[in-house]
Amino acid sequence: MPPVRGEEPMRPNGQPMGTYKYWSPKAQATMVEHVRGLLKLYGDGMRRNADGKIIMQTMFEPIPKPSFDTEGKQKYLAWLEEKYGGDIKKLNSRYKLAAKSFSELKPEEYWLRLEELNWVGCARPTAEDFASRTPDFWRWIDNQTHLAGVLQDYLATMKKHWRELEPNLFIEPLLHQWGYFFNPPGQVDWQTGQRALDIYKCANHVDSVLFIAAPLNAENRADAMALSVEGAIMRNANLHRPFTAGLYLGRHVNGDIYRVVPPAECIGTHVANGAKGLHIYGYSGLDDGGVMFRMDDLFKDSLRAGNRWAANVIPLLTAPRVKEVAILFPAEISLYEPLEVDAEGRHRMDLLGWYQQFTDLGWHVDIVHRDQVAGGVLKDYKHLVIPTNSLYELGDNAALETAVKNFVRAGGNVFHGPHCELAKRALRIKEEQIAFDCIKWAEEIIPHGWSTVAFKGGKALGKYIQSGKTAIAQTTIGNGKVFSFGFQYGHSYSRCTMPIVPPHYGKREMHPVVLLAETPVAALAGTSPLLPMQPVKGVEFARFGNKLVIVNHCSSPVDIRGLKAKKEIAQVPAAPGWLAAHAAICLQIQEPNVN
């Protein structure tokens, strides 16, 4: 960041924090002057969009921090009093304090272990704090909620400043560099869960939401589908407007991920998600932040092939990407839950598994925010998936619940797992906790997950073998259906390990969801009606009118000889009618436009 910050937040000991005081007019003025200097320095040499807008990365990874000077303390305490409606007794109950007023609260009473604060990091609650809803949990929730508001207010204010400085400025700050929903495990300072960052809300105050992602899932495994999830988040945060997709290619220490998912495949994944531009990061540096220039020739050849293919294909994708399935983004988990609280990344893997399952069936999958659902976006979708969200009750979700209820009544379908508070509140789904057991389906299922429940209503589609209770239920509401799974279906589908058949079942043949001849979702949802060929697990399809982008995430070539195409643009050479492994192709198909 620029060395002149105007005004910095202060530590409790009176020392500067080492970053911007984002709400300070002085700090904001230094940012304006910095951008003014760049505009003057580069002049006509600056890159512009086709409409003449100047593309400007107005900020790199903003991280709001509190300030413990007089003004900063007053600001936070005023916010805290407003949040609690002036009810100090409610705050005392949560924080286990005996304060008589908000104004007398001390920093160590209202901020979580403030001695651990620095310009990038902070203290975080433990898993026990989350499980027991301790005072430290509530301090954390309040701290992060406040900082999220600071960031959004900052972006809104700076948008006005940028417009005054240069009306043709295209405002595209880089909001996060280490992935958004999937962060590198073990790198606690770079996780979204302590950044107070909700990019869907930030999107209201910028021209384009941008963050850098990588093909790395929550278990620290190279995974192209995790990158596809991040791309879907970018697309939907930007409301399907043209957007730039970030890709962190200078990554090596996380298992040398680009030896498993090559750059061309990553670029194809972003293009399939609708990206109109690429922000490639990590060419050179002193640590894992930039080692791309040291990569071998195979890596560079793949990058070159991906870039050339994208340059040819992106201009052809002028029609909107098809919308079919919506996954509800677990905003509360993303905002509040540190990685170390999410054991083995299983909450995030549950969303990934749902995304994989529907993508493997050829569906086009979007990831939508509760505010977007409340605003009416579900009218464009056939199915809604609700992944695990253990912090759902922390959100303001009344409008979301009404929208979901209306969606189902109008004919939409909902898929969800256990402990789904949204399904309980909006759809009156009732469940009871039961001991782990296997499920009688067309085949017998060993459920992967961390808890199992039985449902008390609806039609039983699958039953627990021992108790006979309902494991998979179908509930009809109006013209729509709710499909309830008594185990974490997405997490189960994302597994790459084989569970052991419970000993009391002897040598009976049982399998996890991912190894079934036909999964429950495949039986209930079927394949996308727009799919021009039989689905292939690990192959992603994206329709843009009469253009079809296919990305092969598998290690073997895929037979596409059955597709009738007027024109094709392949990333890498392959035998006629075949799509190479870990590569993409764009086809102009001989079918009417699909919008």
Q: Can you annotate each of these PLM segments?
A:
Residues M1, N13-N49, I54-I55, H161, ...:
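Mature N-terminal, pre-catalytic/accessory segment of carbohydrate-active enzymes
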Residues V4, E8-A226:
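Polysaccharide-binding and catalytic clefts of secreted carbohydrate-active enzymes
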Residues E8-P16, E172-G353, L461-K463, A473, ...:
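Hydrophobic targeting/anchoring helices
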Residues T58-M59, F211, I280, I367, ...:
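Conserved beta-strand positions
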Residues P167-L169, N238-R241, R409-N413, G480:
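A short helix->loop->beta-strand "cap" motif at the edges of active sites that frequently abuts
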Residues L197-D198, Q356-V377:
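A short, well-structured beta->alpha microelement
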Residues V377-L384:
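Short acidic/histidine-rich motifs immediately flanking catalytic phosphotransfer sites
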Residues T388-N595:
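A conserved amphipathic helix/loop scaffold
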